[in-house]
């Protein structure tokens, strides 16, 4: 039994024992898909027996069970929370049958199903895999990539992948997969290879066996391997050896372990991306491949490899060469021509050329690979032994391009071959484990030999490769890593569970509830050689039975009967572990520090292995000790500690530290039983006997020592002082003091112990840990605990300087005398004093203090990874107060010295020339640098709050500096650190994908029915009510543009009208009104542009176009379908199209839309087809049509529906703007005969579709100056009419379309049309414009134009009426903004009456427009410039339309003159509109508004008929559109009034086209609900020319001069420019003042303008910067000179700019004039009344709940205050100070200083930390750097109230001086002369020494204290001690023996 207890002593107690049942198994039973049969299959056989009577059935069912049973499997992994950090819970992936269940735990609760998947066939394998989403496939991508986390489910023929974002992929598998592995890059597949693959008669290369897939949408590509050959050079080849199997794959480091079944060896490879040169080597053809090897040579090489001598590790790969893989062509029998995934009869077949993504499922693996596989294909043999004919000699087909391999495995290590190698030595389990010192081991378990082989490996110095070392064998039956505590659990052959760290044994694991194997398992345990077959379900069947093909089972059932008991208990819920003979059978599913044990009775238990330490203090100390000790010693220390800590009945968290101290001291050679302070440790319960393992076990009877211990205990003292004790008059027991004296005399250390030699090193690192803890205000308790240990060690090592340091830090804790353990000289020799050990204690406070004073200090020693705060503080002080910017960027830093075990250069050299303040950078630069650096190293506000307030002050100062004017492009972390939530939220939003934003409108559910279907309820009313807050203009616009309600038909019935005539009258009136109604959708589309995010599961709501009316007074319906009047056919078809476009344009570009949704919206009824056609066009304009599958596009076009074709062609072209996309070009060319070869079949393409296709070509080739396209389009402008009515109607629109398209293709290229000089483009266009003889048609289409039209007799002259508009606009677009005067002069209006007669007046509009667009920079926004475009002859003879009498003239045609006049004016106005589009330029606005008013007056003038009402209406419409362009998106009231007036005009002269123009103007005015404006880029001008072409349709079906669909191209010119400030605290839009700075141009200097946001910004290229102005909101500057991208991304996400209200300010809504904020100003200006403020008023300054609570509880006076009133006043003034200065974070610092002063006054300061902080604050404010800062920025910084600091300083000085005079001088003298000091004075003495920087006695001048006679001499003698003069003045009386203190 004693033997057992000793074993028990070094045991490790496992905790938290729970029965384990995979969660998925339970869930399966209740899963709706789990049908009865599957349920039965999962039940044990015995249950079936009882439920079913027939025994025969049971037999068959049991047979099923054995197959099905093994299909159950599961795996666990560490939980990954959404944010990405690892959380401490399990995730389980469970597979059974065709179901996969993924369940997740969480920190608080048990597992719950996360997702469950059911697939069609049996799941072979399921796994987690992260795919990388990236275009660039370079290696560096894997460092900072976007991951797509997926679950992959392998079935026999395909692989399903489901991402957590909800994306599903399915990849067909071209072969049978034996195994799939998740890698760092994607998936790795192993192909099934049957063992009896017969080599074909023809010698040919073997097939690859391993493949990779980098993304579910990528192809499966073969894996390449690279291995050193026998001759030293490495060779690259495919992995083809079927004997090589993967046994393990690890993600980080990315390595693969393989097993060669022939050689019986394991190899390790690194998995990486293929390099380009390796790709080339593998893909080379045999002729080029240098050495041509055929299959025979390659196999002989492998044979040679396999016969390598046993001793050496084969460097060459066990893989065959595969360089000749291309030599044979595709087998004729392979049907894989049309498959996406390749056939691998050879690599030529691995071709991308024939892989459309269809037809994947139809081929079995055998067919695809021409090899035998597990699927028993009837063709099997014929495929395996293909006759030679099938491999015909044709070489690589020209179009087949081989599949390029993606991944490569690079050989790292192969195990050496022993003398005899067992056949079956494949590793059954492989894992990587790290030992407690960070050394890594690759462990693989060879079950057959009961061996765990551990290979040590490490990274090379340059981190590029792994170096493998020696192999250690551990006897084991099973093993599993315990990651969290860097150990592994090993199940030994005898059933013991043992913990190892690396290859060092830690101890046995004791599992409560399971009997120890040594007791129970003497007979039960099978011999190690017997494989444990039938136990535990999850062992794969193949392992037990071998391949089913080969082994013929006589009867599997009896075998199973044997194990049915196990299966029973497996499902038995309440199984007990105490059954006799239960032993651990295997270990599985390790996660974190939990692991599952499979027991021999089939049940499973999950245990937790205890952690190395739970308290932070012990963890840190262990880390430091581990860091400094040699690895082998460190391992021993950690193992000993772990045994002590984790013994059964181990310590609580409370006593963990005590246990650690005793354990550590024991290992150092102390006898802790005799050391007074460790002896008094109170352990809860008895100590584990492990602590002092050398002692014999104490007898149970007790001893004298126990009694002594009790008398010395705290318990005894409590009993003694108890009342009962006194009342009974018991005499006090004599406590024997002999022991104590005994203690103090002859204590010594045992120098033979493990850590004796390392005591100084351990002491030093623990001291550094102590200094680190001082920088964390939460670790006060830890400091007290650690100081005891440090003081003991410092005493014994005779380190007085350290003792003095600890005394000054904690005077109450450090006794000046204490128990010393003597270390004699001889022993001292054994001690190793490391080079980094300094005689002066490193002190972080002292270091910072010296730094602030500008004194020299040695570099501060720090432990990398442990003392991170010390490093941070040192570097931030060096950066901010010394101005050394390089300190944070350099790896080696002069301010820090890394503590390492390797020797360093002596410290003395490094001490010279230190710490000079550099003036290199400005303060703001230093502050920014500091803040950005701190955020980059992960420092957060929470860390800042735990720094002591004095240390934190410089950092807070820097933060305060940055907060005023931060950079707009700082990261989220930096913005959070400086307390700018507005910026951090902006940065955070910037990283999110564009989607539904803060401002997405939420329609209230209670909207009225009438509003529901007008198509305008998705606008953001909250923002619009801010933009237009004074009136209801938005409702007005909505009323004007709605087309879903019937119109009012007001007709008066005159007496002479019969009822029938009256009805006709009403219907005629309705027909007139319908002209207007049909024009409304175009305007509505503009108004609601991009305002809606559709729900992908719902169809898009399209408001109906209502063409009925209501006649008052009885609201009777008036309808056009009554047949009373003639209604034009198809009248509403284009109106429906426009309605569809308007509905589609509501969809915002960032919406989640896919092809399925687009098709889903297709209407059921044919009459809605036009609407859908418009919807398709709209989707193209907002960029969504690219998602429509090619198949669907083809489908729509073959229907032959004209409108659908128009919408689709224009839509896809707009979506592919300027891309020259070939597939779209092909699509368009079919519809443009001129682009087809002359011999092609003539297709019957409707005219309008041709027009759309031509414009489409222009869009796709926009700005490319593509020669062929330009040539064809140039010819098409003047295309003559052909025979048989071909191209005879509506020629104008086609010619115009060709002109516009040509203009787009050569947009803005001007005279730089490279390679087109022979086309004479400008001359040809000029000819089209003015007329002349038609040129001879060149090129391939000349045949077409030989036969003339029989209908139209034009002869060989150009018909200018047809070609002029297109040619004019083409010239305008080609020479747009080029200021080319010679071309512009061609376009000048004629200046003689004769020439005027030759030009149609409306063409003058186009010419004027074109000329002005070319001379872009000459356009000026005034009427003088407009008039300057009118030729002199017209100006001189222009008539006033208001005159009654018209002048008579024989020479002049007044009609021509006046028409020419109005059209030229209109053209100039239109060009003005283009020039200032979206600018809201006031001069342009007033100029255009004047002309609009003039035209309105002309219409009612007496002589209007001379000009003609139609012409005047056209010109008015053009001017109105120009006006709307300039004011786009602004909702200007004057323009709205004009539009509203014209909306009401519905007389006979107002046709459909004019209504269209007026409502387009209205739409532009409110573009996108005020969120969008127009751009003036070349592309935008081109789009606007198409959309606003100044010839309007006469009626709703008129497309003669201009295709109506083009009216919507304005979308391409719209850009989001609305900036909406959103208050970051309330998350609501608000007003904010912004200032934009315009760059200087030739017209104006750089200017600034203030705008009140929400507002439309000017075009970004005009701006230099934009800033949010104070004083209400924190300032924010966006500098556009650095790039416009940041602001563009803000504007594209609804323009949300987060702003933060400053303290004491109210928003513009609450306080428009800013008067209420004055209250805050008085406080901020530090008036004397500030103190008198009431705490209640604070709520108007700040909304911070913490500050409000502080005011509530600490600043409100109560009735009887008394002395507390003073504190209350102080707190109130501090609070106001903080709020008004906007530094609420300083409140705790103020209060801490106040508390420190109070405790100093009371003289009960237990430690000097707070005094240090006050000292550091005073030093910071008097430091040179701060003084300079104050000088440069008098208004910034000034953190602490200037009145508060002097008060603090005076209070501290006065208190210490009082103490000095009241007897303190005696203590100081005693201290300095090394004599004992009175105990009661120790606290104040320490405060005095710290505050006045008094040096330690040993630093005083050697002559001692006496000897100086004068103060001057004293100053001289103390000069090297850097003592402040004020301190010397106070010391002088003590030192000079003068009783009069010289206090200043």
Swiss-Prot record:
Polar residues biased stretches: 384-393, 998-1007
UniProt keyword list: Cell cycle, Cell division, Mitosis, Phosphoprotein, Repeat, Ubl conjugation pathway
Protein's UniProt keywords contain Metal-binding: no
Coiled-coil stretches: none
Region of interest: Disordered: 312-343, 370-395, 991-1014
Modified residues (Phosphothreonine): 291, 537
UniProt key word Cell division: yes
Pathway named in the protein's UniProt entry: Protein modification; protein ubiquitination
Annotated GO biological process: anaphase-promoting complex-dependent catabolic process; cell division; protein branched polyubiquitination; protein K11-linked ubiquitination; protein K48-linked ubiquitination
Mod. after translation: Phosphorylated. Phosphorylation on Ser-355 occurs specifically during mitosis.
Positions of post-translational Phosphoserine modification: 51, 60, 313, 341, 343, 355, 362, 373, 377, 547, 555, 680, 686, 688
InterPro entries cross-referenced by the UniProt entry: Apc1, Apc1_3rd, APC1_C, Apc1_MidN, Apc1_N, ARM-like, Proteasome/cyclosome_rpt
Top-level lineage group: Eukaryota
One Pfam match: Apc1_MidN
Ranges of the PC repeats in the UniProt entry: 1297-1325, 1366-1404, 1467-1501, 1520-1552
Residues modified as Phosphotyrosine: 571
Low complexity compositional bias, start-end: 323-343
Tissue specificity comment: Abundantly expressed in proliferating fibroblasts, juvenile testis, adult brain and epididymis.
GO cellular component: anaphase-promoting complex; nucleus
Family, as annotated: Belongs to the APC1 family.
Role noted for this protein: Component of the anaphase promoting complex/cyclosome (APC/C), a cell cycle-regulated E3 ubiquitin ligase that controls progression through mitosis and the G1 phase of the cell cycle. The APC/C complex acts by mediating ubiquitination and subsequent degradation of target proteins: it mainly mediates the formation of 'Lys-11'-linked polyubiquitin chains and, to a lower extent, the formation of 'Lys-48'- and 'Lys-63'-linked polyubiquitin chains. The APC/C complex catalyzes assembly of branched 'Lys-11'-/'Lys-48'-linked branched ubiquitin chains on target proteins.
Subunit architecture: The mammalian APC/C is composed at least of 14 distinct subunits ANAPC1, ANAPC2, CDC27/APC3, ANAPC4, ANAPC5, CDC16/APC6, ANAPC7, CDC23/APC8, ANAPC10, ANAPC11, CDC26/APC12, ANAPC13, ANAPC15 and ANAPC16 that assemble into a complex of at least 19 chains with a combined molecular mass of around 1.2 MDa; APC/C interacts with FZR1 and FBXO5.
Listed PANTHER family: ANAPHASE-PROMOTING COMPLEX SUBUNIT 1 (PTHR12827:SF3), MEIOTIC CHECKPOINT REGULATOR TSG24 FAMILY MEMBER (PTHR12827)
Protein name: Anaphase-promoting complex subunit 1
Gene name linked to the record: Anapc1
């Amino acid at each position: 039994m004693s033997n057992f207890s000793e074993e028990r002593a070094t045991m490790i107690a496992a905790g938290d024992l729970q029965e384990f049942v995979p969660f998925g198994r339970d869930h399966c039973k209740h899963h709706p898909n789990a049908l009865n049969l599957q349920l039965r299959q999962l039940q044990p056989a015995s249950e079936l027996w009882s439920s079913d009577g027939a025994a025969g059935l049971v037999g068959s069912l049991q047979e099923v069970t054995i197959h099905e049973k093994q299909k159950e499997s599961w795996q666990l992994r560490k939980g990954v929370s959404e944010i990405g950090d690892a959380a401490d819970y399990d995730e389980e992936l469970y597979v059974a049958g065709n179901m996969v269940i993924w369940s997740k735990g969480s920190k608080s609760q048990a597992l719950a199903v996360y997702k469950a998947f059911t697939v069609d066939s049996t799941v072979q394998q399921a796994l987690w895999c992260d795919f990388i989403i990236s275009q660039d496939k370079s290696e560096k991508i894997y460092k900072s990539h976007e991951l797509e986390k997926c679950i992959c489910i392998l079935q026999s023929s395909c692989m399903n992948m489901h991402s957590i974002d909800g994306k599903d992929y399915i990849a067909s598998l071209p072969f049978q997969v034996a195994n799939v592995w998740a890698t760092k890059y994607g998936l790795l597949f192993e192909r099934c290879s049957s063992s009896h693959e017969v080599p074909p008669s023809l010698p040919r290369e073997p097939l690859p066996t391993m493949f990779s897939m980098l993304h579910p949408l990528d192809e499966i590509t073969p894996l390449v391997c690279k291995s050193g050959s026998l001759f030293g050079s490495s060779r690259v080849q495919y992995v083809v050896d079927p004997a090589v199997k993967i046994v393990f794959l690890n993600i980080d480091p990315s390595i693969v372990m393989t097993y060669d079944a022939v050689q019986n060896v394991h190899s390790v490879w690194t998995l990486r991306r293929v390099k380009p040169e390796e790709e080339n080597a593998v893909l080379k053809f045999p002729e080029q491949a240098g050495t041509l090897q055929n299959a025979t040579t390659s196999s002989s090489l492998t044979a040679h490899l396999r016969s390598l001598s046993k001793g050496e590790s084969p460097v060459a790969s066990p893989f065959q060469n595969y360089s000749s893989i291309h030599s044979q062509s595709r087998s004729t029998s392979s049907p894989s021509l049309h498959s996406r995934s390749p056939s691998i009869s050879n690599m030529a077949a691995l071709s991308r050329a024939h892989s459309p993504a269809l037809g994947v499922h139809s081929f079995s693996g055998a067919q695809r690979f021409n090899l035998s596989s597990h699927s028993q294909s009837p063709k099997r043999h014929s495929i395996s032994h293909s006759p030679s004919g099938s491999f015909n000699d044709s070489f690589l087909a020209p179009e087949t391009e081989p599949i390029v391999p993606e991944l490569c495995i690079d050989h790292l290590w192969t195990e050496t071959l022993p003398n005899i190698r067992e056949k079956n030595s494949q590793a059954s389990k492989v894992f990587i484990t790290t030992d407690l010192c960070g050394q890594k081991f690759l462990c693989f378990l060879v079950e057959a030999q009961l061996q765990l082989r551990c290979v040590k490996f490490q990274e090379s110095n340059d981190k590029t490769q792994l170096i493998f070392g020696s192999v250690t064998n551990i006897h084991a039956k099973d093993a599993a890593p315990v990651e969290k505590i860097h150990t592994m659990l090993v199940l030994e052959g005898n059933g013991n569970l043992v913990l190892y760290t690396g290859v060092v044994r830690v101890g046995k694991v004791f599992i409560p509830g399971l009997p120890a194997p040594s007791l129970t398992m003497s007979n039960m345990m099978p011999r190690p050689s017997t494989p444990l077959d039938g136990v535990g379900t999850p062992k794969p069947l193949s392992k037990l039975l071998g391949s089913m093909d080969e082994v013929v089972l006589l009867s599997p059932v009896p075998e199973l009967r044997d194990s049915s008991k196990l299966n029973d208990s497996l499902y038995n819920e309440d199984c007990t572990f105490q059954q006799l003979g239960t032993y651990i059978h295997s270990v599985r599913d390790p996660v974190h520090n939990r692991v599952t044990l499979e027991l021999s009775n089939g049940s499973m238990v999950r245990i937790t292995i205890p952690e190395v330490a739970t308290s932070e203090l012990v963890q840190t100390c262990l880390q430091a000790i581990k860091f400094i000790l040699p690895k082998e010693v460190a391992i021993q220390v950690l193992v000993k500690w772990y045994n002590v800590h984790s013994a059964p009945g181990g310590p609580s968290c409370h006593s963990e530290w005590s246990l650690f101290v005793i354990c550590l001291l024991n290992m150092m050679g102390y006898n802790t039983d005799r050391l007074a302070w460790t002896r008094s440790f109170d352990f809860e319960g008895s100590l584990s006997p492990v602590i002092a393992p050398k002692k014999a076990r104490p007898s149970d009877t007790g001893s004298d020592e126990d009694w002594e211990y009790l008398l010395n205990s705290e318990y005894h003292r409590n009993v003694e002082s108890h009342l009962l004790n006194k009342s009974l008059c018991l005499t006090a027991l004599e406590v024997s003091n002999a022991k104590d004296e005994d203690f103090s005399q002859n204590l010594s250390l045992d120098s033979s112990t493990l850590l004796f030699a390392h005591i100084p090193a351990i002491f030093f690192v623990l001291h550094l840990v102590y200094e680190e803890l001082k920088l964390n205000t939460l670790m006060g308790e830890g400091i007290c605990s650690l100081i005891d240990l440090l003081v003991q060690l410092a005493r014994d090592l005779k380190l007085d300087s350290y003792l003095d340091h600890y005394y000054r830090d904690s005077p109450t804790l450090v006794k000046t005398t204490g128990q010393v353990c003597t270390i004699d000289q001889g022993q001292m020799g054994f001690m190793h004093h490391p080079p980094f050990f300094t005689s002066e204690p490193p002190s972080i406070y002292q270091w910072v203090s010296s730094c602030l004073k500008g004194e020299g200090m040695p570099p501060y020693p720090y432990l990398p990874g442990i003392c991170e705060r010390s490093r941070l503080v040192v570097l931030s002080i060096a950066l901010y107060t010394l101005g050394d910017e390089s300190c944070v960027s350099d790896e080696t830093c002069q301010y820090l010295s890394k503590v390492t075990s390797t020797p360093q250069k002596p410290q003395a050299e490094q001490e010279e020339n230190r710490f000079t303040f550099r003036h290199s950078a400005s303060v703001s630069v230093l502050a920014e640098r500091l803040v950005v650096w701190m955020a980059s190293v992960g420092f957060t506000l929470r860390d800042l709050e735990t720094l002591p307030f004095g240390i934190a002050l410089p950092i807070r100062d820097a933060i305060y500096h940055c907060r005023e004017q931060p950079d707009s492009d700082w990261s989220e972390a930096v913005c959070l650190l400086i307390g700018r939530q507005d910026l951090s939220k902006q940065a955070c939003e910037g990283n999110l994908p564009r989607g539904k934003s803060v401002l997405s409108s939420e329609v209230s559910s209670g909207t009225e029915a009438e509003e529901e279907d007008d198509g305008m309820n998705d606008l953001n009313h909250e923002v619009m009510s801010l933009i237009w807050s004074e009136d209801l203009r938005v409702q007005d616009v909505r009323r004007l543009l709605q087309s879903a309600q019937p119109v009012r038909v007001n007709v008066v019935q005159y007496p002479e009208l019969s009822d029938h005539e009256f009805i006709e009258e009403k219907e005629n009136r309705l027909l007139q009104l319908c002209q207007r109604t049909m024009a409304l959708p175009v305007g509505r589309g503009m108004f609601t542009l991009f305002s809606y995010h559709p729900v992908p599961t719902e169809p898009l709501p399209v408001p109906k176009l209502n063409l009925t009316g209501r006649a008052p007074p009885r609201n009777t319906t008036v309808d056009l379908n009554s047949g009373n009047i003639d209604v034009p056919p198809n009248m509403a078809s284009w109106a429906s199209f426009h309605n569809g476009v308007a509905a589609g344009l509501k969809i915002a570009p960032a919406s989640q839309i896919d092809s399925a949704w687009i098709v889903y919206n297709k209407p059921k009824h044919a009459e809605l087809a036009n609407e859908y056609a418009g919807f398709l066009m709209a989707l193209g304009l907002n960029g969504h049509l690219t998602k429509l599958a090619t198949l669907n596009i083809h489908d729509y076009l073959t229907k032959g529906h004209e409108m659908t074709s128009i919408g689709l062609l224009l839509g896809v072209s707009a979506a592919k703007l300027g891309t020259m996309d070939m597939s779209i070009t092909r699509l368009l060319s079919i519809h443009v005969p001129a682009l087809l070869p002359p011999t092609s079949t003539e297709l019957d393409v409707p005219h309008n579709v041709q027009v759309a296709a031509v414009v489409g070509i222009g869009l796709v080739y926009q700005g490319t100056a593509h020669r062929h396209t330009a040539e064809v389009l140039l010819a098409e402008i003047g295309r003559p009419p052909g025979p048989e009515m071909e191209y005879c109607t509506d020629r104008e629109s086609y010619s115009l379309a060709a002109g516009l398209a040509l203009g787009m293709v050569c947009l803005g290229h001007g005279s730089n049309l490279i390679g087109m000089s022979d086309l004479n483009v400008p001359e040809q266009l000029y000819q089209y414009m003015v007329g002349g003889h038609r040129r001879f048609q060149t090129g391939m289409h000349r045949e077409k134009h030989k036969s003339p039209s029989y209908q139209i007799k034009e002869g060989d002259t150009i018909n200018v009426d047809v070609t002029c508009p297109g040619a004019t606009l083409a010239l305008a677009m080609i020479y747009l903004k080029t200021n080319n005067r010679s071309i512009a002069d061609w376009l000048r209006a004629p200046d003689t009456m004769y020439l005027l007669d030759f030009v149609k007046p409306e063409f003058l509009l186009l010419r004027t427009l074109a000329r002005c667009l070319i001379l872009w920079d000459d356009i000026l926004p005034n009427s003088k410039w407009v008039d300057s475009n009118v030729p002199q002859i017209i100006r001189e003879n222009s008539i006033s339309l208001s005159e009654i009498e018209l002048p008579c003239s024989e020479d002049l045609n007044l009609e021509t003159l006046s028409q020419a006049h109005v059209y030229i004016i209109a053209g100039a106005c239109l060009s003005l509109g283009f020039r200032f589009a979206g600018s809201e330029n006031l001069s342009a606005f007033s100029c255009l508004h004047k002309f609009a008013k003039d035209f309105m007056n002309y219409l009612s003038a007496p002589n209007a008929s001379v000009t003609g009402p139609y012409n005047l209406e056209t010109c008015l419409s053009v001017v109105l559109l120009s006006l709307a362009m300039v004011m786009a998106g602004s909702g200007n009231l004057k323009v709205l009034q004009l539009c509203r007036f014209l909306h009401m005009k519905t007389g006979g002269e107002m046709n459909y086209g004019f209504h269209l123009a007026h409502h387009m103007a209205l739409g532009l005015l409110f573009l996108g609900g005020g969120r969008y404006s127009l751009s003036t880029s070349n592309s935008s001008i081109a789009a606007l020319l198409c959309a606003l072409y100044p010839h309007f349709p006469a009626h709703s079906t008129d497309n003669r001069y201009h295709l109506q669909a083009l009216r919507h191209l304005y979308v391409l010119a719209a850009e989001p420019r609305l900036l909406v400030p959103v208050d970051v605290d309330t998350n609501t839009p608000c007003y904010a003042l912004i200032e934009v700075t315009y760059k200087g141009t030739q017209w104006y200097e750089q200017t600034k303008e203030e705008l009140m946001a929400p507002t439309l910004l000017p075009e970004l290229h005009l701006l230099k910067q934009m800033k949010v102005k104070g004083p209400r909101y924190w300032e924010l500057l966006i500098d556009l000179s650095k790039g416009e991208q940041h602001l563009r991304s803000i504007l594209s996400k609804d323009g949300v700019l987060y702003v933060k209200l400053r303290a004491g300010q109210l928003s513009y809504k609450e306080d428009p004039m800013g008067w209420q904020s004055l209250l805050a100003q008085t406080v901020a200006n530090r008036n004397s009344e500030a103190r008198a403020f009431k705490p209640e008023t604070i709520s108007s300054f700040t909304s911070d709940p913490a500050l409000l609570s502080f005011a509530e509880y600490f600043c409100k006076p109560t009735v009887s205050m008394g002395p507390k009133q003073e504190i209350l006043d102080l707190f109130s003034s501090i609070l106001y100070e903080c709020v008004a200065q906007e530094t609420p974070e300083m409140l705790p610092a103020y209060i801490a200083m106040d508390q420190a002063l109070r405790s100093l006054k009371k003289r009960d300061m237990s430690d000097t930390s707070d005094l240090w902080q006050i000292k550091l604050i005073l030093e910071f404010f008097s430091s040179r750097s701060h003084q300079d800062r104050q000088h440069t920025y008098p208004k910034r910084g000034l953190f602490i109230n200037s009145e508060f600091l002097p008060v603090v300083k005076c209070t501290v000085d006065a208190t210490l001086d009082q103490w000095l005079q009241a007897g303190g001088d005696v203590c100081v003298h005693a201290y300095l002369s090394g004599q004992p000091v009175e105990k009661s004075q120790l606290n104040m003495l320490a405060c005095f020494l710290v505050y006045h920087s008094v040096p330690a006695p040993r630093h005083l001048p050697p002559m001692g204290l006496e000897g100086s006679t004068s103060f001057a001499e004293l100053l001289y003698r103390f000069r090297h001690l850097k003592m402040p003069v004020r301190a010397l003045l106070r010391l002088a009386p003590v030192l000079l023996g003068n009783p009069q203190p010289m206090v200043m």
